[in-house]
């Protein structure tokens, strides 16, 4: 598809495939977050993290959506240092749902609410909950 070719050319520095197998939304979100937050993205299939903030060295996991739920990894060993959850708007802009540490989200919502996981793989988080938590993130923990 031409749109895929265009995305690959425009964002070639990030080396994303923009494939139509369910990763398209994630790839788009990652490159938009990389530009907005000054991230260097890791190659595909890197566990836990999608990239690192160049100016601070903070490692981040990015979850992207088009107004749907976001997923947070299950397991203490999979909690990312920093977690970005974004909605990609129709005009290509990002709505930041959550920008903070993974530990803050985990302790202040998942543990506090005794949230149920899906088959020990992830927790499902609504955009509304993410926005509420985002308002509580300490300023020093924002990318």
Annotate each PLM feature.
Residues 1-143:
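Nucleic-acid endonuclease domains
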